[in-house]
Design a protein with these regions (language model features):
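Conserved C-terminal beta-signal and adjacent last beta-strands/turns
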Residues: 12, 20, 26, 198, ...
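Periplasmic plug
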Residues: 61, 92, 98-151
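Transmembrane beta-barrel wall of Gram-negative outer-membrane proteins
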Residues: 178-180, 185-216, 221-258, 278-297, ...
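Structural signature of Gram-negative outer-membrane beta-barrels, strongest in the C-terminal barrel
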Residues: 359, 378-388, 423-574, 622, ...
Length: 718
């Protein structure tokens, strides 16, 4: 019994880290033969997994060695350079704060970005409770054993899985023994040191792993230093049938990314110049996670975790302010251009926007896997449930100021009464799911899944109680309290079929549905009559609807030769009642959240990878067409086609910040067993800029004070 079960425990410890090669060994006439079977975990928790040919989607798998080979700064950096359908939007111009875009859906650290990807670390969802944002700086890259990028609206992965899910599994001392230290230096004062060490106790029952990372740079933009400090530690225990792991992730980061700049300022002062400063984010994290698994027998496995996660965020943003006059100091389109080292201070009015967010979350997840025949056919059934609770404290204030000669904002000690926010939020989320894969025969495999989600969101306004009626615009009176109780629920199904006529070809098709509930932040900033500043000067709002996504995917993968693999997939995802942040002001970041009807993402991913001796390569092409599928009117005063501060968006207009075409090529040569050299070549098409949702903006020429600046598009690059 023990000889049968012990390899399964070791496999469980490794399996969800990345798709691994599980060896089926058969002895015949004293000769051992092996067959490599690529196994992929299909749930957020570590589980028994499925062979790749049985999975009806174009899942992408990366192991820790591949991350190490490319010396990626963070996980977002690696994904952008290598994975099909992935691009980045570097709005903040900070290496640890990019938006990751996958098939037109986003995982971003920026509040206000419509989030559409779920991200998990060791089975725990790490999308932040306040806004579903993803802080990439809180995921230590040198602690990652592997990642799975699962496309589509797979309901098994729960809330926010509209366009895909990213599962990250961390290292342990059993699979990563020994130590390493790495130090690098670069331009703009960049310094990075990473260290790790892992091992196993003498009796083999306990393993341990610890890693740390320190990053510091001045930044390529003016006044843009960043310091990132990350710590990860894990201790594990196992016997013949069970395994436990307790891990801790900590971070203390201070990042400055001074954001976008107007084209005319860049032409005048250079690419390194900034608009205003600072744009500072301080993130701290304390994350405890206990994972366990137990085999009841050869066919039944229990996997579970429980966690506590505290994530704190402080921001300080220096902005121009068109709502404040201080003597002869005000704001207009030309004032920033006049602020330089040669000009006197006090030309532009400004504001220091401060926010503080404290997020405490805890919960658990559990699943049972049954690998037992059904009607004499191979079958794997997994049933599970999960609960997540979070408490949110959010505060925001604005201090009036003036922009100095370095484009920093000097505070005047005058606080805005209208911009003060003191919000308490509470969320409770329950989910139950089941997924079953039935092998109809050796070639056909049917997968059916479903999940029921129920989420409650409660906001409590500590400043404006219920019944705080104010005149929000001439003749319009509304209750401006943020307080409210909201609940959302839905059952989301999925079905898929894979066909493997030969060992070198798999064809598949699938349909799945997912949902995203509006977050505490979005529910508090949904009134076009009272637009908000992000992170949020929020106001009393009409309710938002949940977002429902529906995805079709068809594809194939296989081997051209023993050394060349290929894959191809076409997909179509429609979001119903999609949520978007609608900008209403060019200069102060004000806007509101709204359901904008249907949006659609459809496209194609093609991949090819191979090796010839010491030389290896891969190439990938992605096409994406992301469009609005509903006519709507958006409040927008910065678009040249605006009529009465609004624009008309028509069905078929392209979504902003999403490239139509992307090409990625990777080449690597193994000089010695321990030394390789390689290069990545990436090319992305141009995109429509935010604010040009109708794709019709045209920059006016001649008048430097004209409101309508910029082409409305951002150029592609290679």
């Amino acid at each position: 019994m023990h000889k049968t079960l012990q390899p399964k425990i070791i496999l469980t410890a490794i399996l969800a880290a990345y798709a691994m090669h599980q060896h089926a060994v058969a002895a015949e006439n004293g000769k051992i033969t092996t067959k490599k079977v690529e196994v992929v975990s299909t749930t957020p928790l570590a589980g028994v997994g499925l062979p790749l040919e049985q999975i009806p989607s174009n899942v992408q798998v990366v192991n820790g060695e591949e991350l190490l080979e490319q010396r990626s700064l963070n996980i977002a950096d690696y994904m952008n350079n290598n994975l099909l359908g992935v691009s980045v939007n570097e709005t903040q111009n900070n290496p640890f704060q990019p938006d990751i875009l996958f098939r037109g859906f986003t995982a971003s650290p920026l509040l206000g970005t419509p989030q559409g990807l779920s991200v998990f670390q060791d089975g725990v969802r790490v999308n932040e409770p306040f806004g579903d944002a993803v802080n990439w700086d809180l995921i230590p890259v040198n602690a990652i054993a592997g990642i799975n990028l699962m496309p589509g609206s797979n309901p098994v992965f729960g809330l926010n899985t509209l366009g895909g899910s990213l599962s990250i599994v961390t290292k342990n001392g059993r699979t990563h023994q020994g130590g390493a230290v790495e130090t690098s230096f670069g331009s703009w004062g960049r310094k990075n040191t990473a260290a790790e060490f892992g091992g196993v106790s003498a009796d083999g029952s306990v393993d341990y792993f610890i890693s740390g990372n320190y990053f510091d740079e001045d930044g390529w933009r003016d006044y843009s230093p960043t310091e990132v400090k990350q710590l990860f530690a894990k201790v594990g225990w196992q016997n013949e049938t069970s395994r436990l792991e307790l891990s801790y992730t900590g971070a203390d980061n201070n990042m400055i990314g001074n954001g976008l700049i107007q084209e005319e300022l860049m032409r005048q002062f250079g690419r390194e110049t900034i608009n205003t400063r600072p744009d500072q984010t301080k993130n701290t994290l304390s994350f405890l996670n206990l994972n366990g698994s137990h085999w009841f027998n050869d066919d039944v496995q229990l996997t579970a975790n429980t966690y506590y996660r505290q994530s704190n965020r402080k921001t300080l943003n220096g902005d121009v302010n068109d709502d404040f006059d201080y003597g002869d100091v005000d704001w207009n389109d030309a004032c920033l251009g006049a602020v330089s080292a040669e000009d006197a201070e006090g030309v532009c009015s400004g504001a220091l926007n401060r926010s503080k967010t404290k997020q405490d979350g805890y919960g658990f997840n559990a699943q049972l896997a049954f690998s037992q025949p059904f009607m004499q056919k191979q079958n794997q059934l997994i049933v599970g449930l999960g609960y997540d609770h979070s408490n949110i404290k959010f505060n925001q204030s604005t201090e009036f100021g003036i922009v100095n000669e370095t484009r920093g904002v000097d505070g005047l000690g005058l606080e805005s009464d209208e911009a003060v926010v003191d919000l308490r939020g509470k969320t409770d989320s329950w989910g139950i799911f089941a997924t079953d894969t039935l092998s109809l025969n050796d070639q056909w495999h049917l997968t059916m899944s479903g999940r029921y989600n129920h989420i409650k969101v409660k906001n409590t306004d500590k400043i404006n109680p219920v019944g705080s009626i104010e005149e929000v615009s001439p003749g319009i009176f509304e209750d401006v309290t943020l307080s409210g109780n909201h609940s959302f629920s839905r059952f989301n199904p999925a079905v898929g079929l894979s066909f493997t006529p030969t060992k070198d070809l798999t064809v598949y098709g699938s349909y799945n549905e997912g949902m995203r509930a509006p977050t505490s932040m979005e529910l508090g900033c949904a009134n076009p009559n009272v637009p908000c500043k992000l992170p949020n000067a929020m106001a009393g709002d009409p309710p938002l609807e949940k977002v429902v996504s529906k995805t079709f995917e068809f594809g194939a993968r296989g081997n051209l030769t023993s050394n060349i693999k290929w894959s191809g997939a076409v997909y179509r995802t429609v979001n119903h009642d999609d949520i978007q942040f609608i900008s209403t002001n060019q200069t102060n970041g004000m806007g509101y959240f709204d359901n904008v009807g249907k949006t659609r993402r459809m496209g194609l991913d093609l991949g090819l990878t191979g090796d010839m001796g010491k030389f290896s390569w891969n190439a990938g092409y992605s096409y994406l067409r992301a469009t609005y599928e509903s006519d709507l009117e958006l409040t927008n005063e910065v678009n040249s086609t605006s009529n009465g501060d609004s624009i008309q968006v028509k069905k078929g207009d392209r979504l902003a910040n999403l490239p139509d075409h992307a090409l990625k090529i990777r080449m690597q040569y193994q000089v010695t067993p321990n030394w390789s050299v390689g290069t990545n070549i990436n090319s992305f098409a141009d995109v429509y800029a935010r604010g040009n949702e109708n794709n019709k903006h045209q920059a006016n020429q001649g008048d430097p004070d004209d409101t309508y600046q910029g082409s409305g598009k951002i150029s592609g690059y290679t």
